[in-house]
Structures are given as structure tokens and as C-alpha cells.
Amino acid sequence: MADIILGIESSCDDTSAAVIRDGVLLSNVIASQQVHKDFGGVVPELASRAHEQNIVPVVSEALRKAGVEAKDLTAIAFTRGPGLLGSLLVGTSFAKALSLSLDIPMVMVNHLQGHILANFIRQPDVPVREPSFPYLCLLVSGGNSQIVKVKSPVEYEILGQTIDDAVGEAFDKCSKMLGLGYPGGPIIDALAQKGAPERFHFAKPNIPGLDYSFSGVKTSLLYFVRDQIALDPDFLEKNKEDLCASFQKTLIDILLGKLIRAAKETRIREVTIGGGVSANSGLRERIEAEGIKRHWNTYLPERKFTTDNAAMIAIAGWFQYKAGVRTPLDVAPVSRMADF
């Protein structure tokens, strides 16, 4: 009998539901919230209200597109955390109610685990390259920057992580400093493609081991821009493409420097990226180039699976379900999760 898993993702500002059958994606529906752009960031209260409005129609549409009924489901995978508590509570509560009504098990998923396993999302009639275990994953998003050793679909070891800000936050803060809007990552990426990445240079951290730090590079940009505007009020408008290209290159240099070191120390040549920042064109180009240079096997998730989506939650939940993992109904969402 086929395992049919419903995945539910509601950790931030996207309500998503997906259905997989024996590891093959049948549907992936996402309802994004546009209201936050007016505030320059996600407003938790508005996000949770939107999830409440979206969760039922999104799940219904995912089931319809998959061609299955709720009674056909084997289990429900849902994001427990990390994320915004109000948003997570909507998805968790819905998963509990559906689990009770259908008398089927729940499987909680760490949101980051979903990003790590995004390369395993299989689609009908679409060729897919899957990394072999163990592999390294550069996990980069608005809330996390980590190098993870993935031993199996359910076993992970964090080799390094940010000690302050995440790289996605650095992109957003840069965009705000330059008056470019939110979310900053895609805006900076687009402008960077028109700029000169060697034009400006910003401070890079000297952090031991495999950990990251991005607070210093943000401060370096802030002071540099402030000083230049004092000399020329039109500095930003004249140089925004070069500023974006140079700042983006600095962040990518920092990310890949530690990833290269991790690959050397572990002697692992299977390398992936995941998380929202893995959609960045500069990062994708550089990691592929490093892969060729260093004889890595590199794997890049499809861009549509880099941002928050339930397909990755469903595939992570499927792996856990096969491993015998079940989640009790008294589970509560958490904004932070200590480990995987």
C-alpha cells in the first residue's frame, strides 16, 4: 500500500500544503502574504491571521491537485519549528485536528530539516540528482547560516553556524541601508548582476573553526555608506549596482570559505545548499564553480523549493515516517529548536 503524506508548512509568512506518494510529489500549493512589504519585514500578528484564513483552502487545493481525498492519507507531516509561534500554531493545530478526525499519525518536522532534504523532492517525469550520504549542506536563510553534515535522512551534525546574524538578515539589512526595499535578497541579487563585485571591499570576520559571523560586515557597509554620502549625497544612486555586487561577493566569500574548510576536514565531496538564500544566483554560480575546481559533486535544489514550501516538509516527514517516527498529539510548536 502506498504511503501518502500531507505536508503542512506555516513557519513564517507562507501557508503551504503538499502531497507526496511514496516520495513522489503530487502537489505543492503556496499562499504568500504580500501585506508585509509595506512594513519592511514580517509582522507576526498579521502573518498568523493570514494563516488562519489560508490553511483550509490551501490544504483543500493541495488534495484536489494531487487527486486524493483526506481519507487516503497515511500521515500528516507539519512544521513544528523554528519560526513564528503564532504562525506555527496554526499549522500545528490544523495537523492535530486532521490527525484526530482521520485517526492517522502525525510527524513533526524541523523546518531546517526540510531545507536540507529539498534535493530529494521527486516530481513525476522530472530527472533528479540526489546526493549520497554523508553529505555537507550549506544551510542559508533569513534566520540561519549553518554547515550541516547529513549522515542520513534523519541524522544530522551541525559543524558550524552563525554566532550572531544570519546571512539572509545581512542581505535584508543591506537592502534597507541602501533604500532598496524588502525582501532584500532578491533585490540585491538582481542589482548585483549589473555591478562590479571588486569595486568595493568590506570587512570579513576572523572567526575560528567553522562558525560564521555577519554582524561585522553589516557594520562595515553602514559606516562606508555613511562616510561616502557625507562626501556625495548622490553616492547611493550612482553606485547601488556596484555596492550590491561587492556586498554580495563578500557574503559569498565568507560562506564558501568555511564550506571549503569543512569539506577538507571531513573529506566529504558530496555538497548541497538549502534555504531561501540558496536561490541567490551568485551563490549558485560560485558553489558550482568551486565544485568543479575541488572535484565535489554539487547539488542545487530547484529555485521553487528554496523558499518556504510544504513539499520539503512532506519529503522530510516521509523519511521520518519510514524510520518509525511518530509525534504525540500534545506536542507544541517552538520558535527555536536546539538541534535536529
Residue locations for each model-derived region?
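Conserved phosphate-binding catalytic cores of ATP/NTP-utilizing and phosphoryl-transfer enzymes
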Residues: 1-2, 109-135, 316
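Conserved phosphate-binding/catalytic loops in two-lobed NTP-binding clefts
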Residues: 108-109, 288-313
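Glycine-rich phosphate-binding/hydrolytic loop that grips phosphoryl groups
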Residues: 115-117, 301-340
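A contiguous, well-structured pocket-lining segment that forms one wall/lid of small-molecule binding clefts
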Residues: 69, 190-271, 281-294, 321-324, ...
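N-terminal beta-alpha supersecondary unit
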Residues: 2-82, 111, 243
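Glycine-rich phosphate-binding loop plus the immediately following alpha-helix
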Residues: 113, 151-194, 218-219, 223-227
